[in-house]
Amino acid sequence: QGVLKAGQLGHGTPIGSHYTPDAPGYVDMTAVNAHDPERARALLKEAGVKLPLSLSLTVPPPPYARQAAQVVMAQLAKVGIQCRVQQVEWAQWLEGTYRNHDYDLSIISHVEPLDLGNFTKPDYYWGYRSPRFDALYRQLVTAVNEKERLDLLAQVQKLLAEDCVLAWLYQPHWVSVARKSLAGLWDDMPMLVNDLRSMRWVS
């Protein structure tokens, strides 16, 4: 909630896997890796991590990333992880973080819809490799029965959460402000654009 408040002024829904709450088949996975500093310290000890651990947190220009980074840095410090926030421009983020995988931590909003296929690409910038996920995803994209597809979606979300591939934070709510006489605005935004063809002024 602290990250959501800092990054989006509270306008968002916490998520625990790589799927949005408004999509068919969504399963709430926020409890799988809930905020728990005590458990985090125990896991670090179990993994044999020597504290304090120093990491860099690379963030692109948008305010959601740079403001949230301060909260993430403070929260990690409580479990013995010292973060140095590195603010970069988009070109640097794309070249260093995305293309060359040169980063410890980063904060980014994934806006591409239904991009679960990226988890089948071991060379993608988060470097996830899972034969089990690959098999589930192949079944998912070829499923024709809706019940089977929803069941596979649930399994995929659960596996990603349990594997801790990413630390999912929230699905942002994009707030639009318009005159009362403007009709045709989308109630839900499948992408970050406004379809001007559907808009019109009404009396």
Task: Label each residue range with its predicted role.
Residues 1-27, 63-73, 94-203:
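Detector for C-terminal structural segments
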Residues 37-56:
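Immediate post-signal peptide segment of exported/extracytoplasmic ligand-binding proteins
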